[in-house]
Amino acid sequence: DGFMAQTGDVKFGNSNSSDYNLNLAGTGGSILPDLKAEFSDIAHNKGVLSMARSADPNSANSQFFIVFESAPHLDRQYSAFGKVVKGMELIDNIKRGNGANGSVDDPDKIISLRTKK
């Protein structure tokens, strides 16, 4: 079981795209420029949302993840930007992969979400 769910791969992770490929899911990004790292004091506790990236701290693009459990090894290493404030029971039920990249054959999909400032 993984400690987080990652999404936002608009190149290989979009099942409506001709580039869709579960073996490559999590390695693609968007055509927009990468984001510079913005590390904060937000701890990567259960429900925290953070930007996914490659080994380069300044490589965050379209992908983000939601932490299922405390992951202090991510603190001040990944740009946390939010937290689930309602519906954590839905997050707890997200399918968890056990493959090399953690993908699942029939991934759960975000149907709708709201942001709050």
Language-model segments: residues:
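Cyclophilin-like peptidyl-prolyl cis-trans isomerases
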Residues: 1-117
